[in-house]
Regions:
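Short Pro-Cys-Gly-centered "Cys-loop" motif that presents a nucleophilic cysteine in a tight turn
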Residues: 1-17, 26-155
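Histidine-centered active-site/metal-ligand motif
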Residues: 19-21
């Protein structure tokens, strides 16, 4: 829905209980993250309220955002963030493994050609990890191990 209205890359998405996580890469000379999120939140509220017969405000607060490219090591931070998002439903007891989550976006980085009902664009940082998709996926798993061991990488 939103991806056909606005031009952006959705690099990660996961639904967790009462909230969701998105990693959105805006594109030069296209719409802002604020406009994209306004649309997503408005449509989500409309659909939920209609489906449940609810009226009134749906969201508690404005969305939170971080500019990944402004971190000291954007690539390391991006990969750590993907695993943080992937493991969020696991920490909440909603799944046993990020690969089994409701959306399961992490599989797009582990299985070449993996498709979901929403379009996930594999981030270009991922392709810098190796010469082939399988090599990139293997190296990407290093970040899962680091995340699970709570190793702070340099970002």
């Amino acid at each position: 829905m939103c991806q056909s209205k606005y031009k952006f890359e959705l690099n990660a998405a996961e639904i967790v209980g009462n909230h969701f996580h998105l990693v959105i890469r805006t594109l030069k000379d296209e719409d802002t993250i604020s406009r994209i999120m306004q649309f997503i939140k408005a449509r989500t509220a409309e659909k939920y309220n209609k489906a449940t017969g609810r009226v009134g405000p749906f969201w508690n607060e404005r969305f939170g955002s971080t500019i990944i490219e402004e971190s000291s090591n954007p690539e390391e931070y991006q990969f750590w963030l993907f695993w943080y998002i992937g493991y969020n439903p696991v920490k909440k007891g909603e799944s046993r493994d990020p690969r089994e989550n409701y959306i399961g976006f992490i599989n797009c980085y582990l299985k070449e050609g993996f498709e979901l009902p929403i379009k996930i664009t594999v981030h270009h940082y991922f392709y810098r990890l190796g010469d082939s998709f399988s090599e990139c996926a293997k190296r990407f798993l290093f970040y899962e191990d680091a995340y699970r061991k709570r190793i702070a990488l340099y970002f």
